[in-house]
């Protein structure tokens, strides 16, 4: 089975548009936001139009539906990664995710496999966003 970039692009409606001088859109700022395929756009539209409520914040039907969808997504991600559901966290951005990892490593108990020691080094490139340093 071969990988077809053209077929993947068809799943993302934003890539049907052109930008300056009629050039095809190429989006490389995925750290800031990710472009959405039709499956995500449709799922979000369905959620916001039929089930929108705060997750884990209410005892009414919409809150239960929202919570079930949220926890269902967690189960799917855990299964995909071969992880336990309680090992999966959702964050709002790449920066928040990187900060969560940094805090977890910085606060890990000595002897924990994620604990940093004085002899450890963290290597980053000049290309890293300032928020990730």
Regions from the PLM with identified roles:
Residues 1-133:
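Pyridoxal 5′-phosphate
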């Amino acid at each position: 089975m071969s990988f077809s970039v053209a077929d993947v692009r068809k799943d993302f409606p934003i890539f049907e548009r052109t930008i300056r001088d009629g050039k095809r859109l190429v989006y490389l700022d995925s750290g800031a936001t990710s472009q959405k395929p039709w499956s995500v756009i449709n799922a979000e539209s369905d959620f916001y139009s039929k089930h929108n409520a705060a997750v884990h914040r209410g005892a009414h039907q919409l809150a239960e539906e929202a919570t079930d969808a949220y926890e269902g997504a967690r189960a799917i991600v855990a299964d995909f990664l071969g992880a336990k559901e309680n090992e999966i966290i959702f964050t709002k951005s790449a920066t928040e995710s990187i900060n969560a990892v940094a805090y977890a490593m910085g606060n890990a108990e000595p002897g924990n496999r994620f604990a940093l020691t004085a002899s450890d080094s963290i290597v980053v490139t000049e290309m890293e966003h300032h928020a990730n340093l």
